[in-house]
Amino acid sequence: MDIKYVPTICPYCGVGCGMNLVVKDEKVVGVEPWKRHPVNEGKLCPKGNFCYEIIHREDRLTTPLIKENGEFREATWDEAYDLIASKLGAYDPNEIGFFCCARSPNENIYVNQKFARIVVGTHNIDHCARLCHGPTVAGLAASFGSGAMTNSYASFEDADLIFSIGANSLEAHPLVGRKLMRAKMNGAYFIVADPRYTPTAKQADQYIPFKTGTDVALMNAMMNVIISEGLEDKEFIEKRTKNYEELKEVVSKYTPEMAEEITQVPADVIRDIAIKYAKADKAAIVYSLGITEHSHGVDNVMQTANLAMLTGNIGRLGTGVNPLRGQNNVQGACDMGALPTDYPGYRKVADQEVMEDVTCTWGCSDLGCEPGLKIPEMIDAAAKGDLKVLYITGEDPVISDPDTHHVEEALNNLDFFVVQDIFMTDTAEFADVVLPAACWAEQEGTFTNGERRVQLIRKAVDAPGESKYDWEIFCDLAKKMGADPEMFTYESAQDIFEEVRTVTPQYAGMNRERLDRPEALHWPCPSEDHPGTAMMHIEKFAHPDGLGIFMPLEEQGPMETPDDEYPLILTTTRLLFHYHAAMTRRAATLDREVPTGYVEINTEDAAELGIANKEKVKVKSRRGEIEIAARVTDDIVKGIVNIPMHFRECSANILTNAAAIDPKSGMPEYKACAVAISKMEGSK
């Protein structure tokens, strides 16, 4: 019996837990957490523990598929390549779009965006950060000059106070949740603000329920109190920031009493948490999708930055603004330039000098300076007939994007559609060509977690059938389409990473030898003698002048508000046992724990509607309706209902609003849309 242990990184959330894949007879039969790994320290959440169950499933894609007369047939790689190459070459580049995969290693994503830009000639490149932490990238870049988490996870344990807003870490990021609980055990005061009384909120020293979508008003009122009480860090503000007087003027009108009317948080409670946050020597802000997934998500993110700068809680252990990122490599996907506005390393597409530098490095011709379309814009353009061809790698927008009917309409309206994935997803069913890809356990490369830690993943087993690495597929297609072979010839993922270092300044000092250790390296790491950067903005911010920028912001509220026809606000969330659906619902152990969805409804709302616990109800919005079981609970604010987003048979995204978009980031408003709930016909 031949058993080996292959160290790698979990493929689910952005925490980046280390694990060993247990391989027996060339199959992955289990996982063991790394005991020495600095992130998870010998622990894993349920998703990590059972991630191996999807690797050898019989429904893995193993050969290219081409749709003819509405049915898929098996095809050779050459057939598939010829068809794809002919279609990509037949349309104007502006009529073609790419969704990159934030689950995929950095090396795959880098080659994907390079192929789209050089070979196809389009900046219509995006990935799922648009639907989770796009506002983080835009908001923190505007405030601090860098759109990423400021501190490391380990830093939480040095905090005196932790303010968690819009983050249910014990379910969505359990091993970060563990560090927060350890901080609390060390004496940190733990405040949780959330419309739902989540498992994380139940561990708080102080829980603040508030009306979804009113984060700006809540934090403006907190800053009003801090300034009124003279608790702002005057020295930090003077030496390290600008635009303070403009901020002060705006927040002056947001008294706690005014904010109470907006947020439903009592004025005395707002005063209390503001003073506690300001008086703490080291206070950390933690947030996640409850902050970002709004039509004013960038404003929410910039408010967290305002609050931290106002009190000098930046650049020290136990402080900072700490977004908990979504997918395992969503940070890396942003770093690699899977964005319509940015090349690798966040260098701007619109900057002529940047474009000239990139073309010189890559050895290609003019790439143009017009930014491309974001994911919601590509979906809209496809629905209108302006986007003709779409190439999706490892994304499932039929499940994950808002307004499912709109997404399906858009996909049906395409002239040509390619999906590259490991399973026949709900989205892949719409495709003209489906290509089989290797999963994370079947390849080498790097993932970058939410704290900017770049970590190696290692191949444990061969990919099934004729599956290929994503980077290999794009290189094959590039050559098929006549690209210079030297631009797309790599022997390994390591070769690609060496090129990444030349175009991504934050990664310049990293090499395999330095990454081949449990602690790996945090970016920015500009040279090989640089130790990496676990904590950012210690002496200056990343703006050219080194100053942080206060952003005065007014409360906007959700774009869609309740009315007589749709009197409730729907928010959507994630569960401990699921991620999206394509993988976790195929992991038998996880799917058995929560096999289908439900709608959480406040006890008073349920009583007014005559709805009993577990009763099947109809939930309706302006975009569609679903049938789903009710879960009657006191753990959610009256007037708000919640549906987990994982379940196709009762999909929350049939209800969500694709038209409610954050103008600063393109983020759809998953956390607030108006719905009505009614009893099913014939129910008692």
Swiss-Prot record:
Enzyme Commission number(s) from the entry: 1.17.98.3
BP-aspect Gene Ontology terms: formate metabolic process; respiratory electron transport chain
Reactions listed under catalytic activity: oxidized coenzyme F420-(gamma-L-Glu)(n) + formate + 2 H(+) = reduced coenzyme F420-(gamma-L-Glu)(n) + CO2
Description of how activity is regulated: Is extremely sensitive to oxygen. Strongly inhibited by cyanide, azide, alpha,alpha-dipyridyl and 1,10-phenanthroline.
Domain 4Fe-4S Mo/W bis-MGD-type: 3-59
Transmembrane segments: none
Leading EC class: oxidoreductase
Cofactor: [4Fe-4S] cluster; Mo-bis(molybdopterin guanine dinucleotide); Zn(2+)
Keyword Transmembrane: no
Keyword entries, A-Z: 4Fe-4S, Iron, Iron-sulfur, Metal-binding, Molybdenum, Oxidoreductase, Zinc
Keyword RNA-binding part of the UniProt annotation: no
GO molecular function: 4 iron, 4 sulfur cluster binding; formate dehydrogenase (coenzyme F420) activity; formate dehydrogenase (NAD+) activity; metal ion binding; molybdopterin cofactor binding; NADH dehydrogenase activity
Record-linked SMART domains: Molybdop_Fe4S4
Superkingdom of origin: Archaea
pH-activity note: Optimum pH is 7.9 (when assayed with coenzyme F420).
Annotated [4Fe-4S] cluster binding sites: 10, 13, 17, 45
Family to which the UniProt record says this protein belongs: Belongs to the prokaryotic molybdopterin-containing oxidoreductase family.
NCBIfam families with a match to the protein in the record: Fdh-alpha
PANTHER family reported in the protein's UniProt record: FORMATE DEHYDROGENASE H, RESPIRATORY NITRATE REDUCTASE
Cited function: Catalyzes the oxidation of formate to carbon dioxide, with coenzyme F420 as the electron acceptor. In vitro can also use methyl viologen, 7,8-didemethyl-8-hydroxy-5-deazariboflavin (or FO, a hydrolytic derivative of coenzyme F420), FMN and FAD as electron acceptors, but not NAD(+) or NADP(+).
Oligomer status and interactors: Dimer of an alpha (FdhA) and a beta (FdhB) subunit.
Record-given protein name: F420-dependent formate dehydrogenase subunit alpha
Organism: Methanobacterium formicicum
Gene symbol of the encoding locus: fdhA
